[in-house]
Amino acid sequence: MKCFFPVLSCLAVLGVVSAQRQVTVQEGPLYRTESSHITIWCNVSGYQGPSEQNFQWSIYLPSAPEREVQIVSTVDSSFPYAIYTQRVRGGKIYVERIQGNSALLHITDLQARDAGEYECHTPNTDERYFGSYSAKMNLVVIPDSLQTTAVPQTLHKVEQDPLELSCEVATETVQHTHLSVSWLRQKGGENPVEVISLSRDFILHSSSEYAQRQSLGEVRLDKLGRSTFRLTIFHLQPSDQGEFYCEAAEWIQDPDGSWYAMTRKRSEGAVVNVQPTDKEFTVRLETDKRLHTVGEPVEFRCILEAQNIPDRYFAVSWAFNSSLIATMGPNAVPVLNSDFAHREAKGQLKVAKESDGVFVLKIYHLRQEDSGKYNCRVTEREKTVTGEFIDKESKRPKNIPIVVLPLKSSISVEVASNASVVLEGEDLHFSCTVRTVGRLQARFSVIWQLVDRQNRRSNVMWLDRDGTLQPGSAYWERSSYGGIQMEQVQPNSFSLGIFNSRKEDEGQYECHVTEWVRAVDGEWQIVGERRASTLVSITALETGFAVTAISRTPGVTYSDSFDLQCIIKPHYPARVPVSVTWRFQPVGTVEFHDLVTFTRDGGVQWGDKSSTFRTRTAIEKAESSNNVRLSISRASDTEAGKYQCVAELWRRNYNNTWTRLAERTSNLLEIRVLQPVTKLQVSKSKRTLTLVENRAIQLNCSVKSQTSPNSHFAVLWYVHKPSDADGKLILKTTHSSAFEYGTYAEEEGLRGRLQFERHVSGGLFSLTVQRAEVSDSGSYYCHVEEWLLSPNYAWYKLAEEVSGRTEVTVKQPDSRLKLSQVQGSLSVLETRQIQLECVVLNRTSVASQLLVEWFVWKPNHPEREVVAHLSRDATFHYGEQAAKNNLKGRLHAESPSSGVYRLFIQNVAVQDSGTYSCRVEEWLPSPSGVWYKRAEDTAGQTAVTVMRPDAALQVDTVVPNATVTEKAAFQLDCSILSRSSQDSRFAVAWYSLRTKGGGKRGSLGIDEQEEEEEEEDISQEEDSEDPTERTVLLSVGPDAVFGPEGSPWEGRLRFQRLSPLLYRLTVLEASPQDTGNYSCHVEEWLPSPQKEWYRLTEEESAPIGIRVLDTSSTLQSLICSNDALFYFVFFYPFPIFGILIITILLVRFKSRNSSKNSEGKNGVPLLWIKEPHLNYSPTCLEPPVLSIHPGAID
């Protein structure tokens, strides 16, 4: 707690220090129109003292920006200066409080002199000064130039007819403003109804009554031209009846972003009567005025509006304060009640039917008791068959009240003036007319008084009842110079004249008339007095005094003329002198100097530095205004710069002295001396050009129009490639016809191929690229610059334009290379020669060179291999296949005629087999001399098969068997019946053929061998292995080299070649073991083209049966040598034995079925019976083997 109060005190001090007064005012500048009602808000915050703050408004006029002129205050009624006192007191300027710290300044009738810088000040209520106490903003007052006009008319329409009304809306406001236009309909005293409107944001809108019809297109608002707005209602309805007028508002955007309607105007109305197509009718009551004096007449008109009124029946009744006055039936005969019938009889009242739809009530002499409400009622009647009338619908309008005032026996005074607002220096004329009722002998005394803006009253001049004039004390001097005059024009009319008025003459002029009547005793006495006044506003000459410099041509072309206008506002009469001085600031300088001055007495004075302007400048002052025009001819750069005019306003005093009232400086007017507007047009047409290389590319650049016949042109030629971002310069020709090659021409070596030409017509330029290449393809275009000669005789570039593009495609000649596609096959024997032909049927150019390549696809090899190729210069080259297959010495190429190429392969071998074809490349020379491959084609394929000779080797197969005795020799001949080639060689080998296991039986005879072969056939069915054993006796190779002798016969063999086709092998000292089959095997060998021997085929002779007889005979040999004995002993017992076994098994099977019927059903396997397998040999005496396999017998 001890620390709390010090801290609280510190916070309080800090709060006081931190709070400071802040005054804010509406952000300016604000643009408002004359005669409008404006408001400017002002807020104050951060203050101390009472919550309700006071506000004081002041203005700083443009004529004296440093001098404060006080306007109005919420605290001090004497705060306003004299210039504003009258308007403040009259309520035309006042301050409206919004809150205690916020207020609005109201100016109800804004004047041009109200423009300036406004300051809102709040008197201090703080303990000390801290913060801001005032804020300023600018107000600009502009003329109200909005005009809304329409043709006033009355239209009679029938329901469903279309309606079109037009309204002209125009404004001359310099500032950026928006217009809103609305069409409204008004019926009598009802509030207007919006038909359709165009907002300032260009949005169409209608009220709820017309919204649906607008959405359906029944109601439209169209803008025609710049200022005409047309309303269209396509199908009128009875509810559309009324007065149509358009209302326009001009909006401007304030600095805070909000829009403000500166002024609103409405046009004259068009009354539209819509006649319904049904039985409806309307009634309205009209009278001229509602306030009357006793004795005056009044007329009431009851107007009926309906269709076909003559064919219908209506009755009318009149009422006064709900009491019946009179009735009138369809026969138009009035019937009045007793009170009004008496007045009607005296001619003071009349009830009549003026026309079919108009009924009148007239009272010729009103009484005071006639004050009240009047009305009429119209009832439609229907006539029956009997002629009687039945009332139908009845309608009555609103009551019209009138007031009848009693007569006053007094004088009345009327004051009139020649103008309510005059310009300072103009004459003021006032008339005071006295109207009397009776008292023809009365006299009047008149006093003219002036009540100024500060409500101070002063006597100007008075006339007593005896006709004596006397000026007021303040007007003695002016009256002596004739500046103030008063006159009695008629007995009841008095005038006051003030000549060469001044600003201080402004105020309320009052005519005070006193009526004097002579009494019985002859004395004059006042019986009454009346006052009347009129307000006169005198606009100071300097009010709204402004100077504006304008030019219709702020930008002029070389050598042209231009006018400068110095507009003086307002429009002063000729009596008000204004001197005008034109000043000039050349381009690039900071000081102005006087060109010429038009003095107030009409003289002309030239400035010290205007010598260059005198010969080319004309100055003229308008007779009807003080506007001064400066005309300068033959414009050049020296006349470019900023111009300004200075005006001085003078006033002539009543004593013939002069006073300079104000000086105004206009806006800066910058005149730019411009180059001429270009008319350059370059042809934009696009072209597509396709040509074959070595031709010429013709590019045209056409100037369709030019600014001047003296124009020169610089032409730049560009090419754009797809790979480049921008075009590249090829060639430039300047306006002086000089040539410059671009980087592209240098890089691509185009200098020697470019040719530029300007045609005689002058507007066509051509660029030719000779000997076009494929690399010259691209998008070509020209860039044209137009050059003119300035007034200072210097060339300048006026404009430039790019032409349309020419898409150039340079292509190589179309390929016409074509080879023969004939497919072929070729079969040859080894060592022969083959010929492969490649025929060129067509080619692109006779100047082309051909490269011919032969290749081959080998079997089981997917890739092709080059055999050889013939280059473009006719040089023969071997391919990789030639090295592989040793073709280098066997290939030969020739071309017997143009387009025919042959490849010869000599001494062919089997490995040369394959599918052969040729490929031809056609090469052409480019325009630069470089050869390039233009096309290639592949010919039809030729299948080549290289075969070895057919095998024709035959060995004698008919060889007799032989039987020799033991120790004797036997011969094995090998006879070759035919051979495949005379160059062949033979390899011969003799074999001993024995069955496996045959060694146990020893050697067999010929017959035994045959039986053994049958046995071998049976055994082959049971065993897939070869049962024969081959043993080489002797072999002789194709190179005549002997192989080793077989061991059983080693040393017992003798070889002989009896002839080239007969070979003999002799086996000496035969033994029984030599018994058996023998054969000879012959191989035929041939030499390949590479001189290598290969085996062509082989052949084997038939077996030769050799039987070597043993000197001792056995039982076995006896049985085996006798077939009948052999079958009896070894074959017949076996079938008998088999049948016996089968019979036993069948008997046993049946006995088991009878004892065990369900055994098979219980899963016990049935008896499987296999025949016994017997192994026996029909060629030997070994006993047969009986085999019974497992499971054969249970």
From Swiss-Prot:
Query: Where does the UniProt annotation locate this protein?
Result: Membrane
Q: Where is the region Disordered?
A: 997-1030
Residue positions the entry lists as glycosylated: 43, 418, 842, 1077
* Segments traversing the membrane: 1125-1145
Compositionally biased tracts (Acidic residues): 1007-1026
On whether Transmembrane is a keyword of this UniProt record, the answer is yes
Gene3D superfamilies, alphabetized: Immunoglobulins (2.60.40.10)
What keywords appear on the UniProt entry?
Answer: Disulfide bond, Glycoprotein, Immunoglobulin domain, Membrane, Repeat, Signal, Transmembrane, Transmembrane helix
Q: Does the keyword Repeat apply?
A: yes
Q: Which domain of life is it from?
A: Eukaryota
Q: Which residues lie on this side of the membrane: Cytoplasmic?
A: 1146-1194
Specify the protein's topology with respect to the membrane: Single-pass type I membrane protein
Which segments constitute the Ig-like C2-type domain?
20-138, 143-262, 276-386, 401-539, 545-661, 676-803, 813-945, 949-1097
What Gene Ontology cellular component terms go with this record? Answer: membrane
Q: Which cysteines form disulfides? A: 42-120, 167-246, 302-376, 432-511, 566-645, 701-782, 838-918, 974-1080
Q: Which PANTHER family match?
A: V-SET AND TRANSMEMBRANE DOMAIN-CONTAINING PROTEIN (PTHR12207)
Write down what this protein is called.
Answer: Immunoglobulin superfamily member 3
Q: Which organism does this record belong to? A: Mus musculus (Mouse)
From which lineage does this chain's organism come? Eukaryota, Metazoa, Chordata, Craniata, Vertebrata
